[in-house]
Amino acid sequence: TGIQSVGQIAGVSTINIPGCPIHPDWVVGTIAQLLAGESPSLDEDGRPKAYFGKKIHDRCPRKEEDKAKTFGIEGQCLKEVGCKGPKTKADCYSRYWNSGTNWCIGANALCIGCTENGFPDKFSPFYDREDHDD
């Protein structure tokens, strides 16, 4: 399609802050670090490691629970019904949205991988079983 990133067009390095929606802390924290004269440590996708350094599944409170075979069962791991947490890096498990109210897994929904390269196309369909490495 000929689509290029800002970094490709401008020929400069960029810091990527993905998400749907992007958490305000990720933006403000990154800008504050830059204003303080510090460069955030970035991962291979150009994202700040402080926010995108660990897989959601590694810190998920449901990781060790029974694997759900269908939706609507409170507290079970949603990996078998399509949760993208095993492949998605973000600190959603500790950050929460709406002033600390909740996050996708806490709302009994699955992670849709919104902070990963290729979202949403690479992670569609959202509600489909996937094979994961762990």
Q: Could you say what each language-model-derived stretch is?
A:
Residues 1-89:
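Iron-sulfur-associated redox domains of electron-transfer enzymes in respiratory
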